[in-house]
Every structure is written in C-alpha cells, then in structure tokens.
C-alpha cells in the first residue's frame, strides 16, 4: 500500500483474526468510527463499543463517503466495485452513506461516471423487480444481470452507457427493501 502512495500505516490488518483482537482495534483511541460486517456477535460488539458504528450482516456491506473524501476517487471505486461482474460479489458495496455536506457533489460525480438514479415515480416497480418482497430477499432473476436488463424488467428506460443503478433511500431495514443485499449493479 505504501508503494502505491498511501501514507505509512494507512492500511492495516489483523494477521490472526479473533474477537479479542477485533475488540482491541475497536477500542483503540485512534479509531473514530466502526464499520462492522459479519455475524451478529461482530455487529453487537461494534454497537457496544461506545463509538459511532455502522453494522450489517454478512454480505450487505455499506460504504461511507466522509466529507474530506476525494469524491472522484470514492465514486470511481464504488462504480468499479458494483459494475465488476455486475455486482455479483457479496463483498461489493450494497449501499452508500454520504456525508450530507457533500451529497450533491457526490451525486453529480456518480452521474458523471454513468450511474443512473432511479426516479421516485419508478421506485415501486424497481423495488419489486430487484427484491422479492414476499421473501424479503433479492430476486434471483436479477443477480449478476446488467443495469440495462434490470431496468428493462422494471419497465424503466435508462441511457445505454449506464454503469450502475442507484435508488436513493431515506433509511434501512424492513421498510426499505432496497437496503438489502442485491448482488447486482444496484
């Protein structure tokens, strides 16, 4: 990482993972915010740390774009992650949380990089195409499909150069089915 230009110590890892090592990392005074993905024990530990924490289950990882981020780079990384193999990899970001102070700039950059924001009038039909609402899980039909194919199934017309599809949500959980894992370029 340092050879690629990152500052010394910017990228670190725990060579032998354990809950004790993870707890020590979360308790470290140099850690301001925790992003926890994995089993319920990991998420509960993060929420109990006394620090701001974002917790998700296995395979439903969010990304957070903080106010000081390099917006162009952050958006590029997310578009690459979600468009590689049409987002089939469970480690690809399933959602993005954006600091409100840079929201408009991030949205413009996503659009500049080919992202299509699903219009509010199309949201219900898009949601029911992407998520099996009865089972509250991804519709297997859309897994690994192109943005063009998913939009076509939803009855939405998108530009030919669309890289990913974005649905703006105001929350997460059962009331927001699109906040679930999607395994697609959504």
Placement of each model-derived feature along the sequence:
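Conserved glycine-rich beta-strand-loop-beta hairpin in the small C-terminal domain of fold type I
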Residues: 179-186
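Residue-level signal for inorganic ion chemistry
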Residues: 11, 34, 99, 150, ...
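ALDH superfamily catalytic-core signature
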Residues: 43-173
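Rossmann-like NAD(P) dinucleotide-binding subdomain of oxidoreductase/dehydrogenase enzymes
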Residues: 1-73
């Amino acid at each position: 990482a340092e050879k690629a230009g990152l500052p010394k110590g910017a990228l670190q890892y725990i060579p032998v993972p354990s809950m004790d090592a993870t707890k020590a990392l979360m308790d470290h005074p140099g850690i301001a915010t925790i992003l926890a993905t994995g089993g319920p024990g990991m998420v509960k530990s993060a929420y109990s740390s006394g620090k701001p924490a974002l917790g998700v289950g296995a395979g439903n990882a969010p990304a957070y774009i903080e106010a000081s981020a390099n917006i162009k780079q952050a958006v590029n990384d997310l578009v690459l992650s979600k468009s590689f193999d049409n987002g089939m990899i469970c480690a690809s970001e399933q959602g993005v949380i954006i600091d409100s102070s840079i929201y408009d700039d991030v949205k413009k950059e996503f659009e500049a990089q080919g992202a299509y924001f699903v219009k509010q009038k199309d949201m219900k039909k898009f949601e029911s195409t992407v998520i099996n609402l009865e089972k509250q899980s991804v519709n297997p039909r859309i897994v690994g499909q192109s943005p063009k194919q998913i939009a076509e199934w939803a009855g939405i017309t998108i530009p030919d150069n669309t890289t990913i599809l974005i649905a703006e949500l105001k929350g997460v959980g059962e009331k927001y089915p699109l906040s679930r894992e999607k395994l697609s370029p959504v």
